């Protein structure tokens, strides 16, 4: 389907609570190769009205891609390799992991128990 993960973002509480569907695409790309517009366009094309998109790359986003996202006002969050590395370091320091291997081992161990396969709309029912 071209989508790697589906999530939900809850904003507000009580009667003022909104549940937003978040569709995500993740790509492991070379550090010296910028993420181009083709993959981004495919992700944006999957979004329905009111949904948010997230595109995660281990690389970086080319300047034209960033300009296009801003100019066209796509509801898409871009997360690059540097942001991933910074988040991993913060999590490791906050939770007391001694090294990257122990952190990745725990993620690997917990992964299957956390993943559920369902349609984007089903996520709103929880």
Region spans (language model):
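Mixed-charge (Asp/Glu-Lys/Arg
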Residues: 1-126
């Amino acid at each position: 389907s071209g989508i790697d993960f589906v999530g939900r973002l809850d904003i507000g509480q009580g009667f003022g609570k909104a549940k937003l569907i978040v569709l995500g695409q993740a790509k492991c790309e070379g550090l010296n190769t910028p993420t181009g517009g083709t993959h981004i366009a495919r992700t944006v094309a999957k979004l329905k009205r009111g949904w948010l998109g997230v595109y995660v790359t281990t690389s970086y986003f080319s300047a034209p891609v960033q300009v296009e996202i801003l100019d066209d006002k796509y509801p898409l969050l871009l997360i690059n390799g540097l942001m991933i590395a910074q988040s991993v370091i913060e999590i490791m320091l906050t939770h007391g992991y001694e090294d990257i291997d122990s952190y990745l081992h725990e993620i690997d161990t917990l992964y299957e128990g956390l993943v559920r396969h369902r349609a984007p709309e089903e996520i709103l029912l929880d």
